[in-house]
Amino acid sequence: MLAGTVFTLASGCTDMTIEGLARDTPTFDFREYFQGHTRASGWFSDRFGKPRRHFCGDFFGTEKNGKLELDETLFYSDDVTESRLWLVDLQSEGKFSATSDSLIGDATGTFSGNALAMIYTMRVKIAEDKEWVLGMKDFMLLQPDHSLHNITQVYKWGIRIGTVSTQYTRHDGSQMCREVITRQSGGFSRALDTEKAA
């Protein structure tokens, strides 16, 4: 979920489970974490583990009728921009579901301790005029410093074809990913270099 998009990738990762990843602390409260502005950055790796497509993203969460509405915009290194709106319903007994305009069916998942796992099928923009339908498995882990890390296993025609690595950090909306990119001459790559040097 949430910056978990990819294309023409391959991964050698072994299958993960929430039981194998979860720890008791810190407790990951998805609704609380994604309230307000959250920024994401990450990359897609090919079958040899080489990064092929970088991205950054802005997320804005608002609680509505007990659910979290999450507005996501991703900016890719090939100048493709992708937006979607999520509605996340955190249920009892460690389960949740989510809907989005990009999903085929609903996303479903579980959460425990500092971890969350989710599976879904999504239409992903791989170019401005082309989409693929991909299966996704997300594994999110909240770290002691309250940064959030996500590994997404990606499937096409039932075969795992890639992995996405994403890190989320809370922000106050004063510096959005979109603004960092657009104010830097030279575009996305220049903006990434500037962010790393800061």
Regions found by a protein language model. Name each.
Residues 1-2:
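N-terminal export leaders
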Residues 7-27:
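Bacterial Sec signal peptide processing site at the extreme N-terminus
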Residues 17-19, 57, 63-64, 138, ...:
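Sequence-level preference for short, compositionally simple segments enriched
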Residues 22-41:
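Post-signal peptide N-terminal segment of mature Sec-exported envelope proteins
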Residues 41, 46-127:
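Central antiparallel beta-sheet cores of small beta-barrel/beta-sandwich binding domains
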Residues 51-57, 131-136, 160-162:
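Amphipathic hydrophobic-ligand
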Residues 108, 116-139, 145-152:
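Surface-exposed interaction patches
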Residues 137-198:
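Glycine-rich, aromatic-bearing surface loops/beta-hairpins
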